[in-house]
């Protein structure tokens, strides 16, 4: 293991010892915010330091076994011990490297999922509806909640644009690599000649900001317009100006929300989406710089990139970033995304490990 990594692990071991002392003090709970912060840090460091203890024990076993090599009766046993300990150390070093990777601070956050129909007209709108169902089913499998924030329905079904809020621990960590262009190849229901059409949608996954204030939105930078909601009709439609459109003048970002009958609730929802979009712009700029350094395709934040193709006649899904093809499209469209999300996370982790190795 590289000296820089050993030094880091020694430092974290000392920090855990320090936390043990601090948490045992009588006045540890006098400041509950600080106490919770320390307990979280303790919980994160515990498994890492335990693993490092196993690594040091394996190193110690090698030293002990090497001392027996000069004894003819113990030489064979010592060689076996050294080989076994070296194998353990190699695996432990890999595990320690993974645990030392910086944690994405947004991983545990709720998200806003935005799907926009692109090229392909009605078929693209229908596919946007299919994608929303796919992600909704995945959310259900993870026992997350889904809230409709904004929708622009298509006349033939599906959506021209739809935004939902997904509430659940780790939602961003599992879906953050879904942003980008999603292409579908299939025969539309209206196609009489049986020809395959190609359509596309753009997906954006945006971590929810803790508070709107976190993103530092200046009220003077906002233009807020109200208008009458449009919808399927009924006694509550078009009676009041309940729909809200917010424009963030510096960035040109526009958010509309009309799904609630209350203008106040629509404004609150629109502000949350606006905060998430501004945070997302900042995050993508950062990801783009980091990805360029790593020459990475995953997590680059590039929405224009076509990341995936769904081919219905062949029953396959291909993720172009990692050259992964799965022939279980029906299951995937029903929300079975675990194999895919795990593969993307593993590849991203491998890129981070490679970058960590270069840095050391």
Curated annotation (Swiss-Prot):
NCBIfam families: prfA, PRK00591.1. Transmembrane segments: none annotated. InterPro entries: PCRF, Pep_chain_release_fac_I, Pep_chain_release_fac_I_sf, Prokaryotic/Mito_RF, RF-1. It comes from Janthinobacterium sp. (strain Marseille). The modification N5-methylglutamine is found at residue 235. Keywords: Cytoplasm, Methylation, Protein biosynthesis. One of its GO terms (cellular component) is cytoplasm. Its main location: cytoplasm. Belongs to the prokaryotic/mitochondrial release factor family. The lineage of its organism: Bacteria, Pseudomonadati, Pseudomonadota, Betaproteobacteria, Burkholderiales. It holds the Pfam family PCRF. This is Peptide chain release factor 1.
């Amino acid at each position: 293991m590289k000296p820089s990594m050993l030094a880091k692990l020694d430092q974290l071991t000392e920090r855990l010892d320090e936390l043990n002392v601090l948490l045992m003090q009588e006045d540890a709970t006098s400041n509950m915010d600080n106490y919770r912060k320390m307990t979280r840090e303790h919980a994160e460091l515990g498994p890492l330091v335990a693993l490092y203890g196993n690594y040091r024990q394996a190193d110690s076993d090698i030293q002990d076994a090497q001392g027996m090599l000069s004894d003819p009766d113990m030489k064979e046993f010592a060689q076996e011990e050294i080989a076994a300990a070296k194998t353990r150390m190699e695996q432990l070093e890999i595990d320690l490297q993974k645990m030392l990777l910086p944690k994405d601070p947004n991983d545990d956050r709720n998200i806003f999922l935005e799907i926009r129909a692109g090229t392909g007209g009605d078929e693209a709108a229908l596919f946007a509806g299919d994608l929303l169902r796919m992600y909704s089913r995945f959310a259900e499998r993870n026992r997350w909640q889904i809230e409709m924030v904004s929708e622009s329905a298509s006349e033939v079904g599906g959506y021209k644009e739809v935004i939902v809020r997904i509430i659940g621990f780790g939602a961003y960590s599992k879906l953050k690599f879904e942003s980008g262009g999603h292409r579908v190849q299939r025969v539309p229901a209206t196609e009489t000649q049986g020809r395959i059409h190609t359509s596309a949608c753009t997906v954006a996954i945006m971590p929810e900001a803790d508070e709107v204030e976190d993103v530092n939105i200046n009220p003077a930078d906002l233009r807020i317009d109200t208008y009458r909601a449009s919808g399927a009709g009924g006694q509550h439609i078009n009676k009041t100006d309940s729909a809200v459109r917010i424009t963030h003048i510096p960035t040109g970002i526009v958010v509309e929300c009309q799904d609630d009958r209350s203008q106040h609730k629509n404004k609150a929802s629109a502000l949350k989406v606006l905060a998430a979009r501004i945070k997302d712009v900042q995050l993508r700029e950062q990801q783009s710089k980091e990805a360029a350094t790593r020459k990475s395709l995953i997590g680059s934040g590039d929405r224009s990139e076509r990341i995936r193709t769904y081919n219905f006649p062949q029953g396959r899904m291909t993720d172009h970033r990692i050259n992964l093809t799965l022939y279980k499209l029906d299951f995937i469209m029903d929300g079975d995304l675990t194999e895919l999300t795990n593969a993307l996370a593993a590849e991203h982790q491998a890129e981070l490990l490679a970058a960590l190795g270069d840095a050391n």
